[in-house]
Regions:
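Short secondary-structure boundary/capping segments
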Residues: 44, 153-156, 233-234, 288-291
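Iron-sulfur-cluster electron-transfer modules
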Residues: 52-56, 243-348
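Iron-sulfur cluster-binding cysteine motifs and their immediate structural context
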Residues: 179-181, 212-236, 263-290
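Residues that form generic nucleotide/phosphate-binding pockets
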Residues: 18, 42, 236, 286, ...
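Noncatalytic alpha-helical scaffold of FAD-dependent oxidoreductases
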Residues: 1-140, 144-186, 190-191, 195-221
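N-terminal leader/propeptide and maturation segments of large enzyme subunits in energy/redox metabolism
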Residues: 1-6, 14-17, 222-228, 237-250, ...
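Short, charged low-complexity linear segments at domain edges
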Residues: 174-199, 228-255
């Protein structure tokens, strides 16, 4: 930014010269608003696109850390080395250079016996690197969660941590507010309740449940969003494969009928917002087809084969309904339709 166009042009020229001296081969500054938005969309898509490139069946892990900006270059090198050292070779690093802030994403399959132990060792090494060697921040931009809570004291020191705990206890003596998320005495909390993303459907297996799709969904906040439909589908498949809790699986299957299947518009607007184009609506249509019985399939086949006759009958039926409304009082019509809905279990 600059106070005027002339100053901005001068600053851009200086930046181009500086970048050129350091080996940059493609430098493109633009003041075109549409182009700027397009470039920002690419940047915003790093998170989901990186997650979609992970091996199927693995969970995506992401954190954001920071170091003094004057040490950013060596910090990037050390972060890359740390990720590689612990076997996270597919990890990507991006962030906000002006703040010395790095985001990194990696993946692991926590159904494997050694995955949690490897993540434990990595997390301790990450804490030592960031808060020890670089005197930086383990949570540079986003909030502390259980993956970092075990290392808050190492970053801030025992005295500051004690003050935090005392303030927390003063305002929340029963530990009801966000329990164990910011402050947690369990040194292994970061490797407990690790999330898995089991294979459920090829249409959704690359979803990282980022939620970018949710604002576009007509049923969001009414029943379930696309992200929630995917999460429930994964949990149902996990329970089905493991045989862990048949009663819970039965309840999920039953409840999903309305919340997941019946209220999905199957419009696939979610895929427009999704950085990798996941079509939750197509998945739902597939699940609907699986739940249809032989009778429903027979009716659907008949309608498809006799579309013209069915449309004629429907037009006739609507005509009869119009005539009936002129003869039968409105309260009686309402009573008839209510009775039909009750008898048909709300299918009519």
């Amino acid at each position: 930014t600059a106070p005027d166009a002339a100053t901005l042009e001068d600053e851009v020229a200086k930046a181009i010269a500086l970048l050129s001296r350091h080996g940059a081969t493609h430098i493109d500054f633009s003041t075109d608003e549409a182009r700027s938005h397009a470039l920002w969309d690419i940047r915003k898509g790093f998170f989901a696109s990186g997650g979609a490139a992970r091996p199927k069946g693995t969970a995506m892990l992401t954190e954001d850390v920071a170091a003094p900006i004057e040490r950013l270059a060596e910090f990037v090198i050390d972060m890359r080395a740390l990720l590689d050292e612990h076997g996270y070779h597919d990890a990507i690093i991006f962030g906000h250079a002006l703040a010395g802030n790095l985001h990194f994403q990696m993946s692991d399959d926590f159904s494997l016996p050694d995955a949690a132990a490897r993540f434990d060792v990595f997390s301790k090494a990450l804490s030592d690197l960031v808060s020890g060697q670089y005197k930086g921040s383990l949570k540079a931009e986003h909030g502390t969660g259980r993956a970092i809570a075990a290392f808050v004291e190492a970053e801030w020191g025992a005295k500051a941590y004690g003050l935090m705990a005392a303030i927390k206890s003063l305002f929340d003596p029963e530990g009801l507010l966000n329990p164990g998320v910011l402050l947690n005495a369990d040194p292994k909390i970061h490797i407990k309740h690790l999330k898995s993303l089991p294979l459920a459907d090829e249409l959704i297996d690359m979803c990282i449940e980022c939620g970018f799709c949710e604002p576009a969904c007509p049923s969001h906040q009414m029943t379930l969003s696309p992200r929630q439909r995917i999460a429930v589908t994964r949990e149902r498949e996990r329970l089905r494969a493991s045989g862990e809790d048949p009663e819970r699986l039965r309840r999920l299957d039953d409840d999903f009928q309305y919340a997941g299947l019946d209220t999905c518009a199957a419009c696939n607007l979610c895929s427009v917002r999704c950085p990798v184009g996941i079509e939750t609506g197509t998945m739902i249509m597939g699940q609907r087809a699986q739940r249809r019985g032989d009778g429903a399939r027979a009716v659907a086949g008949f309608v498809a084969d006799h579309r013209g006759s069915v449309e004629t009958l429907m037009r006739a039926g609507l005509g009869v309904a119009d005539v009936a409304r002129t003869v039968i009082p409105a309260p009686a019509v309402a009573a008839i339709t209510d009775t039909a809905r009750r008898i048909s279990s709300k299918r009519l």
